[in-house]
């Protein structure tokens, strides 16, 4: 019995060794396959990362190119605004909208600094506290709506008082293009508003307001000259556009006065 047990025991050992010998190459193959799969995954991830980096670089390059194009557009107008836009008829719809947005952003930032500084002023205008996003966004949206109303006013006066077919697109392009010199003035105003020099802030605020109405009158004059038989005199056409602007300001003043009074009257 003992010999039979020894033989069976030896057979079991031999079988286990054969199984281990068979499993060993299989385990090597599985490890090799796993390494290969990991390498393939890494190789797949590399192109994705490279594509992601390339897309980010492309977007940054496109943004920088757009900034350069707008700067070239702005500098070409700054050299001689009236001649370039009014006489030569040079304007651009997309850049005109960008000019309106840039001016609105600059004025909204400077207005918030004036609103913040008004706490310590004698008359106490703007003494109610406004967070940056509140004071900034309200004025920004208000200015964008104001420019939209101005475009509508120029379109309506041109179409019904001067009998000249002017599209909204053309009116926005010319008005935004003529706004470029006002942006240059508003940058100086922003510096004085941040530094909090009330006298210079008031002077440049008045200059900005007069400049906006001046470019509106300049554009109305261009449309009037293009009209062959305008039934109404040019001066009344300008009065009509200014009246629409003042009416809009009067209607919206109760809602916006606490935000922009500090910039208009920094006392």
From Swiss-Prot:
Its main location: membrane. Residues 29-46 have a biased composition (Basic residues). Keywords: Cell membrane, Membrane, Transmembrane, Transmembrane helix. Residues 1-55 are annotated as: Disordered. The chain crosses the membrane at residues 93-115, 135-157, 173-195, 199-221, 234-256. It is a multi-pass membrane protein. This is Uncharacterized protein YebC. Residues 9-24 have a biased composition (Acidic residues). The keyword Membrane applies. It is found in: Cell membrane. It comes from Bacillus subtilis (strain 168). It comes from the Bacteria. One of its GO terms (cellular component) is plasma membrane. The keyword Transmembrane helix applies.
């Amino acid at each position: 019995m003992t010999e039979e047990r020894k033989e069976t025991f030896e057979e079991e050992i031999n079988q286990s060794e054969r199984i281990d010998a068979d499993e060993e190459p299989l385990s090597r193959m599985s490890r090799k396959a796993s390494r290969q799969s990991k390498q393939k995954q890494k190789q797949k991830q590399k192109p994705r990362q490279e594509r992601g980096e390339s897309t980010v670089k492309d977007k940054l390059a496109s943004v920088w190119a757009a900034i350069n194009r707008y700067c070239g557009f702005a500098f070409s107008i700054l050299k001689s605004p009236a001649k370039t836009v009014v006489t030569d008829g040079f304007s651009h719809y997309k850049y005109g909208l960008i000019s309106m947005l840039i001016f609105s952003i600059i004025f909204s930032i400077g207005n918030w600094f004036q609103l913040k500084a008004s706490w310590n002023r004698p008359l106490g205008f703007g003494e109610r506290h406004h967070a940056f996003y509140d004071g900034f966004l309200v004025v920004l949206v208000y200015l964008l709506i104001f420019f939209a109303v101005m475009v509508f006013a120029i379109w309506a006066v041109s179409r019904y008082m001067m009998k000249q077919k002017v599209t909204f697109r053309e009116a926005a392009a010319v008005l935004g293009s003529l706004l470029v010199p006002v942006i240059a003035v508003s940058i100086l105003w922003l510096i004085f508003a941040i530094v909090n020099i009330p006298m210079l802030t008031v002077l440049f605020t008045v200059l900005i307001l007069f400049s906006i109405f001046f470019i509106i009158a300049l554009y109305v004059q261009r449309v009037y000259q293009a009209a062959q038989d305008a039934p109404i005199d040019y001066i009344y056409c300008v009065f009509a556009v200014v009246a629409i602007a003042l009416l809009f300001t009067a209607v919206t003043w109760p809602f916006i006065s606490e935000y922009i009074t500090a910039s208009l009257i920094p006392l």
